[in-house]
Amino acid sequence: MQKIILAYNFTPERLQALKLICMMLRTQLRAVAREELLQPVGYLAGLPEVASVSEAYSGDEGQEEMLLMCGFSRQDLDRLLAAVKKGKLRQVALKAMLTPTNCTWSGLQLLRELSQEHAYMHGKNADK
């Protein structure tokens, strides 16, 4: 699998900063459009075994920025996170690696899961 980052819900300014990081790391970047939120993340990453869906997303849910790293080694991930921290982006709260488990999930499903995990890890869970 080729190295690619899927970027969800980035403003044009923050997307430009991410593009610079990707150029420096020689990594492909794909900005995912809102209407593609229902597409399986594996399909968007170019996995031939994951099929697309015909439905386009038109809702308001899932506004948070999210990065999905595909085909990354641990060293690649460390370099990306260091570049984000040192650069204009500073941080992106929701991040994940493409896995055999999440490759069939939609971007919206992954956003929901990561948002819940992030809230729990930062003590924002009402069920505590």
Segments predicted by a language model, with ranges:
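Noncatalytic linker/hinge segments flanking ATPase motor cores
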Residues: A45-A51, C70-Q75, S106-S115
